[in-house]
């Protein structure tokens, strides 16, 4: 069983990887992925051995709060921005108090500056009050940090909580010594770290605020889509408008769509017309004109006039629901490149705590001053600096932040990745296999000519009547041609479809019930064919005389022109060093002509579904990383076989199960865009990881004091600033993907 839920209380990648590690050890858990950024988890488990409630209890034991739905954040007295502003104000107050004697002129009264027991104590008490206020503003670090430590799952908050608490306790001890006159000399006099506590917390709060703002912006794509989802719709019942919940709509319901309202579910216009904003599907801002017979898709907005539509999908299976599911899965899943960071994060925090303790002991022994409290002060500064400067957040944010921003960028291009692995793998593709009809071509073959051995209207009636039972694009072209010429469409029975060949049905022909067949030449038993010299898609119409013999009645010649700009986009793809193939069920002449015209390297014609599978299998056995690009209707087996499957979809044509990448703008440029975006994203992730590893590799030793003899020591305050800047730099670097642009050359 697969389930998705939310987890509150996570602060860094050590939290998410700790949950994965803990639950992953359970025999009944098959797979689990936890996303820090959108606080979600996807889990697959054996429902015969456990249930979701038991899994929730396991997570709660680790100190986190699992929930089936993400509750709204509790409204606090102070907003995040106000809390941050107060933290900055009180930090500056404490820092000024601690440095008052060094400032000239000082705004502090003389009574707080004199070097004596009373003034030092009074100054320190004011610093303590300011520090306690800042600690209260940043109390979440202590609540989450110590809770995680208690459950033996230490995280970034644990490091901050331990470091600042140690500094506070030491300062309180020093305050006690000053108050009771137990200090021995000037080295132990007034060694307070209240300003360090404040500065550390302030910098971390600033960094976290920047992270959260950036994360919220990256999550805007999904939030915007969810806002497009209407909760109710107007259902027509007995000529009356009734407002109903969208979840109650079933296929076949007649709905009224008013100007300015969103389409509730996928459907087809049956009365009226409208202009729809389909930018959430295609990325194109211009409204699309819709008339009777046109499809409309959930989440799109009606700009002008009202119309009636018939629902063709329920809410769960509508286009908008599938897009939201894809985005959620993409944001919740993990790329393979993130596994290294997860492994490091699992041991990072415990290792940092061990290093900090070791550094404290070493400095307590080797500190150069003879006074214990001086040595203790140096050792404590090193201890706090090591804890605070280490940044598991930079490692944890390196991959998911880039994936999050990349998915937002993809949606603006009309692209949707099924998961992070799809986004990661697209850049590795070296062979692309294209379907022809509906992918490279317009997908709407039109009849060029008809060659008939019987009365033309009778042939059109037979072919149109049978083909109306099919959803194939060629069938639609024939049906439309028959309707335009007012051919009467008959009732069919015993309709049978042979995938890749054609369709047959029993109908009235010359007063007798006959089996009429429509399809390619291989669908028929040997018959006398007409000599057709035209290039195009040949569709034969025949009558079954017996099980082994068919009579030819006529031939339709159709053509399907390439989409505008396809040739240029194929050239772009080939410039990336990618081999291209065309697999089509069309005849050799048409497929060859299309391949040569578009500059495609190789082709296979008359390809049945099994032929396509065999070719893809052959390419993969040669070591090729294969991407299949199809329309998602008749290519599901081939799409499933590929390393990366791209579906060129229009609304409800999308098959989420078959696709790794879905393009709603129905443009081959999307393939090039997906590959380039994948390349840019992985490059961005590698930059983030390089910075995160280098930062921790360099700054942790510096915080330990390895350059002490060169007079380089990092104070806890500077360590806090460096830690905040490291995670912020990763976030800001990820944001550069927002400016990603597809070059046309």
Curated annotation (Swiss-Prot):
The active site is at residue 435. The chain crosses the membrane at residues 84-104, 125-144, 152-172, 195-215, 344-366, 380-397, 686-705, 717-735. Pfam families: E1-E2_ATPase, HMA, Hydrolase. GO terms for molecular function: ATP binding; ATP hydrolysis activity; copper ion binding; P-type divalent copper transporter activity. Its EC number is 7.2.2.9. It is a multi-pass membrane protein. Signal peptide: none annotated. It catalyses: Cu(2+)(in) + ATP + H2O = Cu(2+)(out) + ADP + phosphate + H(+). It is an enzyme of class 7 (translocase). Residues 1-67 form the HMA domain. Mg(2+) binds at residues 631, 635. Belongs to the cation transport ATPase (P-type) (TC 3.A.3) family. Type IB subfamily. This is Copper-transporting ATPase.
């Amino acid at each position: 069983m697969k389930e998705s839920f939310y987890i509150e209380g996570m602060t860094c990648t050590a939290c998410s990887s700790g949950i994965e590690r803990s639950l992953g050890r359970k025999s009944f858990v098959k797979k689990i992925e936890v996303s820090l950024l959108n606080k979600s988890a996807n889990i697959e488990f054996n429902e015969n051995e456990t249930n979701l409630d038991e899994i929730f209890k396991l997570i709660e034991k680790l100190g986190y709060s699992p929930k089936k739905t993400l509750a709204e954040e509790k409204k606090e007295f102070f907003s995040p921005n106000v809390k941050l502003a107060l933290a900055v104000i009180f930090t500056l107050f404490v820092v000024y108090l601690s440095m008052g004697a060094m400032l000239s002129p000082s705004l502090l009264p003389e009574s707080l500056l004199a070097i004596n027991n009373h003034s030092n104590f009074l100054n320190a008490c004011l610093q303590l009050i300011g520090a306690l206020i800042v600690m209260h503003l940043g109390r979440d670090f202590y609540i989450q940090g110590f809770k995680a430590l208690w459950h033996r799952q230490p995280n970034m908050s644990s490091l901050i909580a331990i470091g600042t608490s140690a500094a506070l306790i030491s300062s309180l001890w020093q305050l006690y010594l000053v108050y009771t006159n137990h200090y021995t000399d000037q080295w132990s006099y007034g060694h307070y770290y209240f300003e360090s506590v404040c500065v550390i917390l302030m910098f971390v709060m600033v960094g976290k605020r920047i992270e959260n703002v950036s994360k919220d912006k990256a999550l805007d794509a999904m939030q915007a889509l969810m806002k497009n989802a209407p909760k109710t719709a107007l259902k027509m019942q007995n000529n009356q408008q009734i407002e109903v919940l969208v979840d109650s709509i079933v296929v076949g319901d007649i709905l009224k769509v008013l100007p300015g309202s969103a389409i509730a579910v996928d459907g087809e216009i049956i009365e009226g017309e409208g202009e729809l904003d389909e930018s959430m599907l295609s990325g194109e801002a211009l409204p699309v004109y819709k008339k009777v017979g046109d499809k409309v898709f959930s989440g799109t907005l009606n700009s002008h006039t009202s119309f009636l539509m018939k629902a063709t999908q329920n809410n769960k299976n509508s286009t908008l629901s599938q897009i939201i599911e894809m985005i959620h899965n993409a944001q919740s899943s993990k790329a393979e490149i993130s596994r290294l960071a997860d492994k490091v994060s699992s041991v990072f925090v415990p290792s940092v705590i061990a290093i900090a303790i070791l550094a404290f002991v070493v400095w307590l022994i080797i500190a150069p001053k003879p006074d214990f409290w001086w040595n203790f002060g140096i050792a404590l500064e090193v201890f706090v600096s090591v804890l605070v400067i280490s940044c598991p957040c930079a490692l944890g944010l390196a991959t998911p932040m880039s994936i999050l921003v990349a998915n937002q960028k993809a949606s603006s291009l009309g692209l949707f990745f099924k998961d992070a692995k799809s986004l990661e793998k697209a850049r590795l593709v070296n062979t692309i296999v294209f379907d022809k009809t509906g992918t490279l071509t317009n997908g709407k073959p039109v009849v060029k000519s008809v060659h008939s051995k019987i009365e033309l209207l009778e042939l059109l009636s037979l072919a149109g009547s049978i083909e109306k039972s099919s959803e194939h694009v060629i069938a639609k072209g024939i049906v439309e041609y028959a309707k335009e010429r007012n051919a009467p469409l008959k009732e069919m029975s015993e309709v049978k479809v042979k995938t890749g060949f054609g369709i047959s049905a029993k109908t009235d022909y010359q007063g007798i019930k006959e089996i009429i067949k429509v399809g390619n030449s291989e669908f028929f038993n040997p018959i006398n064919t007409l000599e057709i010299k035209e290039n195009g898609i040949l569709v034969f119409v025949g009558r079954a005389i017996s099980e082994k013999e068919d009579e030819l009645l006529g031939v339709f010649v159709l053509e399907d022109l390439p989409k505008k700009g396809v040739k240029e986009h194929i050239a772009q793809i080939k410039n990336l060093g990618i081999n291209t193939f065309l697999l089509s069920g069309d005849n050799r002449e048409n497929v060859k002509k299309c391949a040569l015209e578009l500059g495609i390297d190789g082709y296979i014609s008359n390809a049945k579904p099994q032929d396509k599978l065999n070719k893809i299998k052959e390419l993969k056995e040669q070591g090729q990383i294969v991407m299949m690009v199809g329309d998602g209707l008749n290519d599901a087996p081939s799409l499933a076989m590929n390393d990366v499957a791209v579906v060129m979809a229009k609304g409800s044509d999308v098959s989420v199960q078959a696709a790794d990448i879905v393009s709603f703008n129905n443009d081959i440029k999307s393939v090039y865009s997906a590959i380039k975006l994948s390349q840019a994203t992985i490059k961005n992730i590698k930059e983030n990881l390089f910075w995160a590893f280098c930062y921790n590799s360099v700054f942790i030793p510096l915080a330990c004091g390895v350059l002490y003899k060169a007079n380089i020591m990092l104070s806890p305050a500077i360590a806090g600033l460096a830690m905040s800047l490291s995670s912020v730099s990763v976030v800001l670097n990820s944001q550069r993907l927002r400016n990603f642009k597809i070059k046309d050359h």
